[in-house]
Amino acid sequence: MARKVEKENGSGPIKSNHDLVRGVWQLFRLHTIEGLSTASIGWLALFFYATQQQLAFDLVRNAFIGIFATYQMTHCVFCLWNDICDRDFDGKVARTRDRPLPSGMVTLTEAMWVFVLGVFASMGVTYWLLGADVTLTMVPIWVLSFIYPLCKRIIWAPQVVLGLTMALCVLPPWVAVRKNSGSAGLLPASLFGAIFCWLVYLDLIYASQDRPDDQKAGVKSLAIFLGDYLKAGLTVLGVLQVVCFVLAASEASAGFLLWVFGIAVWSASVPWSIMSLDTRDRKSGGRIFLVNAILGIYMAAVSGLNVSLAMW
């Protein structure tokens, strides 16, 4: 509940900004689809493996549930960590100054306690649902998620660290099912490449809306570094992600449904996103980011439908 404080002139109680429950909810990004979009990367990889290996329904179902719980919790906890690290920057950027930490909705001490408890909870849930091997595979993801916010102060391409973090999310699903599978060939590598290029591309689009404020605040970003060549960089990343997805679909022996409603739709989205991005409009990047986040969920759904039809 929001605490009440006294006005300095003693004229009566007013509401403070402090609201722990609402603040943690927002720090966890539970008011957005970002967590679901993160889980969809794991689901997408799982469904590609299931298509290639013709996995049993029970195995896919159990991995699906475990991936959702693990990736959702990991996303929540490290979004909170990102906001802890960025609290001073966020207060200087128009779009983020109302976030829970700079606005006083949650104190730094409270946020740190929730973060520590959340890390242990994420590890415990991963071990319980997916086992020791997958938990070990998640360790690099947790480490990179911890490092990523700090990179904004050190290197000009923190998006590369984020891309590596999210691309590694294609590996735990494979570890979860590999005991019941044969060789995956180039499928894990091609999925890794596709997700890496997509996430760097996606975060560049997102970061484009904050470039003026980030420059003033001293935040390092590939979007700032590229300057007028931003769309050229997006084009290269867009082509590479499509090439990697085509290779992944070929490796998985994808059916007509996945090729037409998955790969083709994804390929068409790339030029649309780049041409629609208006760097003069501060809200353009956010809109296109949201469309692409939904696209990731859509791609996972199409891949899942493809697997379901093959099973039945």
Swiss-Prot record:
The keyword Metal-binding is annotated on this UniProt entry: no
Parts of the chain that traverse the membrane: 30-50, 64-84, 111-131, 132-152, 154-174, 185-205, 229-249, 255-275, 288-308
Keyword Glycoprotein: yes
Glycosylated sites: 9
Location in the cell: Membrane
GO MF annotations in UniProt: transferase activity, transferring alkyl or aryl (other than methyl) groups
Enzyme class of the recorded protein, top EC level: transferase
UniProt similarity note: Belongs to the UbiA prenyltransferase family.
Protein name: Polyprenyl transferase atnF
UniProt source species: Arthrinium sp
Gene: atnF
